[in-house]
Amino acid sequence: MASYDKISDGWYRVCPKRSSNRALITVKLPFSTLFRLKPMTDITPFANRLGKNIKHLMKWAKRNGIEAWRIYDRDIPQFPFAADVYGDRIHLQEYDTGWLMRPEEYEAWLAEVLEAVAFVTGFAPEQIRLKRRERQKGLQQYEKTGKAGDDFVITENGRKFWVNLDKYLDTGLFLDHRNTRKKVGETAAGKRFLNLFSYTGSFTVYAATGGAASSETVDLSNTYLDWAKRNFELNGIDTERHKIVRADVFQYLQTAYGEGRRFDLIVMDPPSFSNSKKMSDILDIQRDHKKLIDGAVKLLASDGILYFSNNLRSFVLDDLVSEQYAVKDISKQSVPEDFRNKKIHRCWEIRHKS
């Protein structure tokens, strides 16, 4: 159960206990004014939208060999959820809205949502994993939930990946980058590939299985590099030609350039912010992206391509980047069909100017 802190007559903060296996709401008051959310007692609009999305996307997912795909993307504001199919399970994320609700109203509302998801999808309740995403800075994908869960394999475009819906806030595979992964796989043949801020190495899996001559997969987290290694093994990737490198990306860029290493294809998908103690400095992508892009382009072959992406909503690409390099915004093409929110990330194709 959660703890309830009384604010005033009839109003409460709902705070989850760490041991709870349900994701309950935590309300922070940004202003002195309180406001009520009109309870959405009718679950029908949510259920109908969920059913409509599944009907539209299920054949598409099967046709494309995709076992992990989004079936609901905060389509209706009163139901602020993202729901993803992962094989025979559902990953359901509730987003923090700052709403104030009475405890009993919230519990009833959440139970209705879960019941609707189970009914419409046909998945058993125990196959649905519920999480709550708070508004906060930092490397959310590196944060543990306190649950162990189990690892299992899903398939995407003929590649296999280990995922875990319980242990971390993120699952091990960012579904919104599916299109860019596919593009990398289609263009990597014979090329030297570099994956920066690699997370679990999914871009490298596409590059290696797409015929890349060699690759380097760079991240600072041992946990996620071990995960990447398992993904490589799952797809029969030779770790002699496709190396895994634990390093601070800023330091790696300097070292690799000094050693004369060059790459034909680079992917860089950094977090918006990181204060990891393992890094030499705090990463702020708005402040630091020009330095990162400059360092990556130095490693590009004359006809090479850098794909640079991030998910900071307020992000603005430095004008100097477009002045110095040939830059193409490919954000629209990079967001998959199953994502309603076409601003979930931004992505650019960056080359040397001819």
Swiss-Prot record:
Q: GO CC terms on record? A: cytoplasm
Question: What is the enzyme's main class?
Answer: transferase
Highest taxon of the source? Bacteria
- Which InterPro entries does the annotation name? SAM-dep_methyl-trfase (IPR019614), SAM-dependent_MTases_sf (IPR029063)
Example GO molecular function: methyltransferase activity
Q: What PANTHER family does the annotation carry?
A: RIBOSOMAL RNA LARGE SUBUNIT METHYLTRANSFERASE YWBD-RELATED, SAM-DEPENDENT METHYLTRANSFERASE
State the protein's purpose. Specifically methylates the guanine in position 2069 (m7G2069) of 23S rRNA.
Name used for this protein in its record: Ribosomal RNA large subunit methyltransferase K
- Tell me the classification of the organism that encodes this protein: Bacteria, Pseudomonadati, Pseudomonadota, Betaproteobacteria, Neisseriales
